[in-house]
A protein has these predicted regions:
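Short alpha-helix boundary/capping motifs
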Residues: 68-69, 89-90, 106, 125, ...
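Conserved nucleotide-sugar donor-binding catalytic segment
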Residues: 2, 6, 10-91
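Terminal low-complexity segments of carbohydrate-biosynthetic enzymes
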Residues: 122-143
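Catalytic core of nucleotide-sugar-dependent glycosyltransferases
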Residues: 78, 86-111
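Amphipathic alpha-helical repeat scaffolds of TPR domains
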Residues: 115-122
Length: 143
């Protein structure tokens, strides 16, 4: 029987905090997102990129001036195993992430230094051994 870790991670972000956070990381937990279909279509719908379609969409919606909100109570319980961290590595994954930040830069959503910093962080993270990436996600990013 699997031991359940009841650690809860909330994204305690509001309007301006969501915009600021989105310039570094995904501001929403996709499984618990609700939105108006007309707003998604207005922002261009989901991209056909291989990974991170949700992050691309949230950025497109925020660039279009739409507002987001994080409900301050957990709605979904999710587990993360080592495969989650393995999927967040490799050349293709880095290219997709860097392209997202390039798109954000070209739209004027992030500055050039923000684009460079975020891209460098993604390259380092995806190049790191799986155990180190897992440690960083659990101990640094989810604190």
């Amino acid at each position: 029987m699997e031991k359940i870790d009841s650690k809860i991670c909330l994204r305690c972000l509001y309007d301006k905090g969501i915009v600021t956070f989105s310039k570094k990381r995904n501001p929403f937990n996709h499984p618990s997102v609700m939105y108006r279909k007309k707003d998604v279509l207005k922002a261009g719908n989901y991209s056909d990129v291989r990974y991170m379609q949700d992050y691309y969409l949230w950025v497109d919606m925020l660039i279009a001036g739409m507002k987001g909100y994080n409900i301050q109570e957990p709605l979904v319980w999710m587990r993360a195993d080592s495969n989650l961290f393995k999927r967040r590595s490799g050349k293709i994954y880095v290219e997709i992430q860097v392209n997202l930040f390039k798109k954000m830069y070209k739209a004027g959503y992030v500055t050039y230094p923000q684009y460079l910093k975020s891209s460098a962080i993604r390259v380092c993270s995806a190049s790191a051994p799986n155990w180190l990436r897992q440690f960083m996600f659990k101990k640094v990013l989810r604190k």
